[in-house]
Amino acid sequence: MNLAAMDPQTYDTQLEHKRIKLEQAFAQFETPSVEVFASEPANYRMRAEFRMWHDGDDLYYYMFDKVLNEKVRCDQYLPASVLINQMMSALIAELKPNPSLRHKLFQVDFLSTLSGEILVSLLYHRQLDDQWRADAAALKTKLSSQFNVNIIGRARKQKIDLDKDFVVESLQVNDKTFLYKQIENSFTQPNAKVSVKMLEWAIDATQDSEGDLLELYCGNGNFSIALAQNFNRVLATELAKPSVDAAQYNIEVNGIENLQIIRMSAEDFSDAMAKKRSFRRLEGIDLDSYVCNTIFVDPPRAGIDPDTLALVQGYERILYISCNPETLKDNLQLLNETHKVTRFALFDQFPYTEHMETGVLLERR
């Protein structure tokens, strides 16, 4: 974190520097002009995590500033959603005078939504007892007069959900509203409004598609659910069980009938497609019946492994969302041999940082 860089007055300048840096880094691939999708300059993060500092009777949130090389008190936090900032004030006022709720509390995580829900996770260096549960229930009741809130307590090998451990986000994407179950401690795009722009860009990039879509690393179905409208069928893979469970919920609640999720890694799916191995999880699924001309990938920061990259290269069109330009660049060294970048986008998920979320559409030469 660099608090000094978080100045809305300089946001446009910082974003322009990112655009120039990205175009220069990928110049060798003869990409089209970068499509730039800006963030709100403040209150854009739908989740935030804070450490807790105990100083006598005082208790406050803090973060570590890497530039100053010291902890910084955070009574409010400019990047966080308005809802998180409101909850920060209300929560700390209740925690300070309560011995049970504050004892050995070392971290608080917030997960909020544009739809008005917020989930608060309290993390402790001690086991949570019945007194904590009673006080946490009373805290939830009091906060519920102002917020649509749920509370989770966490300690070593212990998790207590007072009600539920998820929120349901509502995103307006073009003329459609999509609902997404987002589970505590699972990956979600932190900048919801930029996430909407990413979905709209992906839908536009794949309009008039023919055949089916294969998606690897689908998470909670964020992209595959929105993209299903452009394809006959969608087949998606994800390894993390909580994400798969959320994806199944999201498929049902959004009424998507042409999307199937398989719980397996991209590496195993590559082996299955190459018929190197058979998998029980694929029983009853005829992979050969899918006519996937397009593949969508949103890999982790490490990029795509060599076997999966070889699989990806076999498709006519590749839609690649990357959270790490360096690994995207490495992967493009191979993909550029057979495919040409026809769309190139910068999504500013993380203002005031060096981080760049990018999207490329590649089509076979």
Swiss-Prot record:
It holds the Pfam family tRNA_U5-meth_tr. Coiled coil: none annotated. It catalyses: uridine(54) in tRNA + S-adenosyl-L-methionine = 5-methyluridine(54) in tRNA + S-adenosyl-L-homocysteine + H(+); uridine(341) in tmRNA + S-adenosyl-L-methionine = 5-methyluridine(341) in tmRNA + S-adenosyl-L-homocysteine + H(+). S-adenosyl-L-methionine binds at residues 189, 217, 222, 238, 298. PROSITE patterns: SAM_MT_RNA_M5U (PS51687), TRMA_1 (PS01230), TRMA_2 (PS01231). One of its GO terms (biological process) is tRNA methylation. CDD domains: AdoMet_MTases. One of its GO terms (cellular component) is cytosol. The keyword Thylakoid does not apply. The keyword S-adenosyl-L-methionine applies. The active site is at 323 (nucleophile), 357 (proton acceptor). It is an enzyme of class 2 (transferase). InterPro entries: MeTrfase_TrmA_AS, MeTrfase_TrmA_CS, SAM-dependent_MTases_sf, TrmA_MeTrfase, U5_MeTrfase_fam. Keywords: Methyltransferase, S-adenosyl-L-methionine, Transferase, tRNA processing. Its EC number is 2.1.1.-, 2.1.1.35. One of its GO terms (molecular function) is tRNA (uracil(54)-C5)-methyltransferase activity, S-adenosyl methionine-dependent. Gene3D superfamilies: 2.40.50.1070, Vaccinia Virus protein VP39 (3.40.50.150). Belongs to the class I-like SAM-binding methyltransferase superfamily. RNA M5U methyltransferase family. TrmA subfamily. HAMAP family: RNA_methyltr_TrmA (MF_01011). NCBIfam families: trmA_only (TIGR02143). Dual-specificity methyltransferase that catalyzes the formation of 5-methyluridine at position 54 (m5U54) in all tRNAs, and that of position 341 (m5U341) in tmRNA (transfer-mRNA). This is tRNA/tmRNA (uracil-C(5))-methyltransferase. It comes from Shewanella baltica (strain OS185).
